[in-house]
């Protein structure tokens, strides 16, 4: 229970829900106001600011006239700003920025909770389900999130539902009633009230504000997405890796380098999906960010939020390349590599259990498992014909050997790789599975659990690369220098 800190002295104040002393408070406010004044997009998603005279909250890079310092308030999350009565700016759309990289880096209960909320756990299982996954009471989780972020799990999930609803309203022609329930709202009335409170507009007005050409006519056409990223993004090495690892029937990478299309099947809580992601950059914002274009086909629209979050983890879109490049670029051995590939990512996975089995079995064996035990899609799409077999199916079908042992451990919960799993506990549980060695456990920790600071066992990796050793290894591999470095 050491993750939970006791309340500090009364002399402390709050900034973004984080307790701090008066001097640190003023310094933090000054630095954040400077980021707002200079419209520094590097801080988009790291914090939000609200203007008391207008009732609007924005991202730091908002192009609107900079408000007076005395009228500005700062928040750690969009949910905290919404909870204080502020509405999203229609000009900079602060709800659409990449999430804070902290939630992927942090291994404490707040980071784990934010990853689970992003995966839709609160919508599916409620606060009690979230707390149970974290191993704490609902009251403890509420208190910790509110203390650090200025918003509890319900408010954080509400902000996420609002964003999902806006995406569906502005990119599809689905009836508003369907969108309400697909976004996770319990009723149309709750949906209407929330949209009006968050965006100062009715759902119909929000839809009318988007160009009609941006909306797809039917669910079969898929949902067009702009998967935003912070700072520079090196799509080439990510797609190279996806192409090398692609398992036939489940994944496909097609097209020439620089214009490749990655497609894969998805097993989701309510149904299945197929996603296509374009390698070509979709655009930039002042040279400091942009997006990847994607199209998502779902059998159940309630899976939209979860599917998007899993794609973001696969492509490592919420990373902070500025922090990573600054630390690694200070090392003489890595500086030329960082200069050559600024914003290089450490890819994750769209399905942690699937990745763990594949990492242990290898590509050829994984393809055999798919063809023999994978579930055939009701509507195959070209070469995408199957879902990767679930752990329970593999454990029953092939109980012998290392992949079967791992599948059994995943199926019975002995090994947990969900977004809220404790990384240290998961690695120890993996090492207890017969046939799983330290190298496999390390790659699963880096890719399936999204740990940014993993070094292969026995590798001569300096501590000065912490907390970004996973990214350092990505640079060495992309440059073809990993074998020499080892």
Can you say where each PLM-predicted feature lies in the sequence?
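HhH-family (HhH-GPD) DNA N-glycosylase catalytic core used in base-excision repair
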Residues: 2-486
């Amino acid at each position: 229970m050491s993750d939970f800190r006791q309340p500090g002295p009364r002399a402390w104040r709050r900034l973004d829900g984080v307790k701090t002393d008066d001097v640190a408070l003023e310094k933090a406010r000054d630095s954040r106001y400077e980021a707002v004044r200079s419209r520094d997009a590097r801080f988009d998603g790291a914090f939000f600011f609200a203007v008391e005279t207008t009732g609007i909250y924005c991202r730091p890079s908002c192009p609107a006239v900079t408000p007076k310092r005395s009228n500005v308030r700062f928040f750690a999350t969009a949910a905290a700003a919404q909870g204080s009565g502020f509405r999203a700016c229609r000009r900079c759309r602060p709800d659409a920025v990449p999430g804070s990289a902290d939630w992927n880096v942090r291994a404490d209960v707040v980071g784990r909770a934010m990853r689970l909320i992003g995966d839709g756990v609160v919508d599916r299982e409620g606060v009690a389900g979230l707390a149970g996954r974290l191993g704490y009471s609902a009251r403890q989780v509420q208190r910790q999130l509110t203390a650090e972020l200025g918003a509890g799990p319900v408010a954080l999930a509400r902000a996420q539902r609002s964003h999902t609803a806006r995406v569906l309203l502005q990119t599809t022609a689905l009836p508003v009633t369907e969108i309400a329930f697909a976004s996770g709202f319990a009723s149309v009335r709750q949906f209407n009230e929330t949209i009006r409170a968050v965006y100062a507009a009715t759902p119909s007005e929000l839809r009318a504000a988007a160009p009609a050409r941006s909306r797809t006519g039917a669910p079969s056409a898929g949902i067009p997405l702009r998967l935003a990223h912070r700072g520079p993004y090196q799509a080439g090495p990510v797609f190279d890796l996806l192409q090398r690892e692609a398992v036939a029937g489940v994944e496909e990478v097609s097209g020439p380098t620089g214009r490749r299309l990655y497609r894969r099947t998805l097993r989701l809580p309510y149904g299945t999906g197929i996603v296509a992601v374009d390698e070509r950059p979709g655009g930039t914002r002042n040279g400091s960010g942009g997006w990847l274009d994607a199209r998502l086909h779902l059998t159940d629209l309630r899976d939209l939020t979860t599917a998007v979050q899993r794609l973001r983890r696969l492509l490592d879109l919420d990373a902070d390349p500025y922090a990573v490049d600054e630390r690694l670029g200070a090392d003489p051995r890595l500086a030329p590599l960082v200069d050559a590939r600024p914003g290089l990512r450490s890819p994750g996975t769209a399905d942690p259990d699937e990745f763990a089995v594949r990492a242990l079995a290898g590509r050829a064996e994984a393809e055999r498992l798919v063809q023999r035990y994978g579930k055939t899609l009701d509507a195959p799409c070209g070469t995408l014909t199957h879902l990767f077999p679930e752990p329970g199916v593999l454990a029953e079908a092939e109980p012998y050997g290392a992949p079967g042992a791992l599948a059994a451990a995943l199926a019975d919960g002995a090994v947990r790789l969900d977004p809220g799993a404790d990384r240290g506990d998961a690695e120890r549980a993996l090492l207890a599975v017969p046939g799983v060695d330290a190298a496999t456990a390390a790659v699963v920790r880096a890719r399936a659990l999204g740990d940014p600071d993993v070094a292969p066992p026995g590798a001569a990796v300096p501590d000065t690369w912490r907390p970004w050793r996973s990214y350092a290894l990505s640079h060495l591999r992309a440059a073809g220098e990993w074998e020499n470095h080892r």
